[in-house]
Amino acid sequence: MAHPSQLGFQDAASPVMEELLHFHDHALMIVFLISTLVLYIIAATASTKLTDKYILDSQEIEVIWTIMPAVILILIALPSLRILYLMDEINDPHLTVKTMGHQWYWSYEYTDYDDLSFDSYMIPTQDLTPGQFRLLETDHRMVIPVDSPIRVLVSAEDVLHSWAVPSLGIKMDAVPGRLNQTAFIVSRPGVFYGQCSEICGANHSFMPIVVEAVPLEHFENWSSLMLEDA
C-alpha cells in the first residue's frame, strides 16, 4: 500500500498492474531520451557561432522529423494497446462480485451464492484499533481467493462513483443505470486498499475500499461463516 513520502507506484499485486509498471518504465525511458535530445539541441543552438540564414528548406530534415515521431508513437502505442486488451479480457471467472456505490459507502454481493451480500462502511477515526489506517479501514472487507480469476460488476445507486484499487491496477467507474465490469487475478495474499476515485459529494473522501486476498480454503471458511450469519 502507499506510505508517507512515497515517490513511486504501490507494489503490484496482479499481473495487470505488473504490466502497467513495465509500460510506465518503458514510456518514461522514451520521454527521458526525447527530453535529453531536445535539451542538447537547444544548448547546441544557443552556444554555436555557426549560422546559416540562407537555408530555406531541407528535405532530409523534414523526413527525419516526420518519421522519428511516428516511430516513437508506435513504440508507445503497441504495448499500450496490448495492456488495454489484457485489461478488457475476462476468461472463465471463478467468482463474480457485484459492487454498488452509494453516498457514501460500498455494497458487495457475491452472485455465485444465494444470500451473501453486505455493506462496507468506513470505520470512524475514534473507533480504530492500533495498526489500522485512518480513512482506509472498513467494517467489512471484500474477501476473495488468491490466484483465481475474479469478475467485478460495478454500478451505482445514486451518483457517479469509481471503484479503484491501485495495487491491482483497477479503476472502474460506477455509473447509475449502467453495469460496468472488470476482471483481475490477485497474485499474492494480502490486504489492498483503495478509495472512491470520482468526486461524489460531501463525503467522497470517506468511502474506502478494502480487498482482502486469502487462500481458497480460507475464503471457503469465510463464505460459510457469512452465510450462517445471514
Swiss-Prot record:
Compartments, record wording: Mitochondrion inner membrane
Record's catalysed reaction(s): 4 Fe(II)-[cytochrome c] + O2 + 8 H(+)(in) = 4 Fe(III)-[cytochrome c] + 2 H2O + 4 H(+)(out)
Membrane topology: Multi-pass membrane protein
InterPro entries given in the database record: CcO_II, CcO_II-like_C, CcO_II_C, Copper_CuA, Cupredoxin, Cyt_c_oxidase_su2, Cyt_c_oxidase_su2_TM_dom, Cyt_c_oxidase_su2_TM_sf
Keywords tagged on the record: Copper, Electron transport, Magnesium, Membrane, Metal-binding, Mitochondrion, Mitochondrion inner membrane, Respiratory chain, Translocase, Transmembrane, Transmembrane helix, Transport
Sites where the protein binds Cu cation A2: C196, E198, C200, H204
Primary enzyme class: translocase
Cofactor(s), by name: Cu cation
Single biological process term from Gene Ontology: ATP synthesis coupled electron transport
EC number(s) on file: 7.1.1.9
Residues binding Mg(2+), per UniProt: E198
UniProt subunit comment: Component of the cytochrome c oxidase (complex IV, CIV), a multisubunit enzyme composed of 14 subunits. The complex is composed of a catalytic core of 3 subunits MT-CO1, MT-CO2 and MT-CO3, encoded in the mitochondrial DNA, and 11 supernumerary subunits COX4I, COX5A, COX5B, COX6A, COX6B, COX6C, COX7A, COX7B, COX7C, COX8 and NDUFA4, which are encoded in the nuclear genome.
Family in the record: Belongs to the cytochrome c oxidase subunit 2 family.
Record protein name field: Cytochrome c oxidase subunit 2
Organism encoding this protein: Tetraodon nigroviridis
Highest classification ranks of the organism: Eukaryota, Metazoa, Chordata, Craniata, Vertebrata
Gene: mt-co2
